[in-house]
Amino acid sequence: GNMVPNKLYLNKGNMIFEDISDAAGVAGDHRWYTGTTMIDINNDGLLDIYVSVSGKFAPRTNQLFINNGDLTFTESAANYGLDAEEEIIQTTFFDYDQDGDLDAFLANYPSTSFRTPNVKYQFLKYAKDLEKSDRLLEQQADGTFKDVTEAAGILNFGLAISASIADFNNDGLEDIYVSNDFSTPDFLYLNNGDGTFTDKIKESTNQTAFYGMGTDAADINNDGLIDLMQVDMAAQDNRRQKANMASMNPELFWSTVNAGFHHQYMYNTLQLNRGTVNGTPIFSNIAFAAGVASTDWSWCPLFADFDNDGYKDLFISNGTRKEVNNRDYFKQVDKISGQEQLDQSLALSLEMPEEPIDNYIFKNNGNTTFSKANEDWSLSYVGFSNGAAYGDLDNDGDLDLVIN
């Protein structure tokens, strides 16, 4: 939770859950907690909990709760070298070097301003500052983690909101797709098999999302190739599009391209994997053709076979409590300057527009197109949603959804 206690719910069966957060010792101390990963970090057969921490205020150290086997946990991040202090959004564990243990990729979102010019992003990209880069940690033989970010070739500035791990070029090695916010380009790190990675985002894709949000990787057409969904913030209806689409500004778009970044558009991308050329995966963005290009202020895309027909369907959570991209709001703020703007900052923030919206769930039609299925599947909720996860919570053979 963000500056509120974390929650751990014990599944008692029959869709009944018990809050054991305090008794288990995982409630935390009101840090700005972001992503949570459950992983058996010490190979004892028990699930541990790794919680990423962001925000502007200390303490900002990630926490690792080791499972004691009796429904209690002991915080041990420092003992494992996992006490990162950057502004980490989410951590993903995977075996990038194929040595039989799990390593960690930490998606970092360093502090920035939404009005930061592209020339500063360009400068930061080449500054090679570890505190402003995603991080790669290699697990050592003794179970501790060592930072190998620079040695692996991924010391780059970015505003990461998510990272998806998959073998995108079918060479048996796990690669990394990093979704970055604002003008900072995404990264597609291909695993070279020697402990290093090479960014191939421009070679592999024609364009990406502008406000890169959540991602998920899956084979949507059962051709044996891993595809990728990346969500952005484009609304379906014309009114909300015009009110909230910053990238409708041509000057902003071309300043991004001319700064050496990628072609980025404020729409979702569904990257269909068409195979490889000399080891580089080639993607075609089919989001519009597939019917999934605009899902409003989206956060978490999840591919899963919700109707058990053999094809991966798509769930997308969306919503924002305050619409900080609203063009009309910005015009109002720009009329006020200097000390007056500072004095009225709280009042202005409270006046930001807000509009609850529905999540999206799409049925995979089996032909690389999707159909919205909210009503057919009785999954409509008008509100403000962020994270989501799926699993068979009642052991009935189908997938259930938890939405924050």
Task: Label each residue range with its predicted role.
Residues G1-N404:
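Acidic, glycine/proline-rich Ca2+-coordinating loop motifs
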